[in-house]
Amino acid sequence: MRAISKPATRRSLVAFSRCLATGSLVIATAVAVAPAARAQSGADAVFAVTYLDVGAGAVPQGVELIKKYRDQSRREGANVEFTILQETSRPNRFVIMEGWRDQAAFEAHDKGAAKAEFEGALKPIRNSPPDRKMLQPFANAPARRIEPGALYMVEHVDFLGGDPAIAATAAPLEKTLAEASQKEAGVVRYEIYRMPPPRINHYQVVAAWTDAKAFDAHETAAHTLEFRAATAQGGRAWRANLYDQRLYKAL
């Protein structure tokens, strides 16, 4: 058997090392540039959900515009979340879920150039003015990794009137629903936010499941059915909008 010369061996090792280094660099670069949609937030964090739409013929333009705004916003140091969602059944409708380190950071972004540029470009192609709701964490869970293809659900929950008794009854019902839903096998996000006083009878659910099958399992789960029975007309806390779920995909 002919022995491999030492120079050839050294050349092979050098080439192999270069391949490893290049591969490691590619992996590290991919990890570094992949933006985190959510980060752990502190007690002073401020959140908002915004519903918006564009004309049916302007969907591609709207998608590019909202993606640009997302990328600009995520680069701001005080941003803790900037998730954009597109409605599955009506692709001209979108949701922005954003979070900021504190009120000062939120206000700085709100008055910044990226926000002004986005709203200026959106105005000619939108059907309606954006509808933004300020939120406070109510029943939240640590951020998890959400893989592509997850099915999102955003729901606004409005309990009738400003009756303190109704608000007091609704709060534990919402907590119980969140805690049970967060334990589901297919759930990757289930969080309930509440609007600031005096509108404490308004909640916002932002949730995601691995796929449609996991979402369907949530819909028929005992804790979901119990919550809906308790909040339907004649229940312990009446809802004004029992059927206000919308399904989305992440952009």
Can you describe what each PLM-predicted range is?
Residues 44-88, 95-98:
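The feature marks the first
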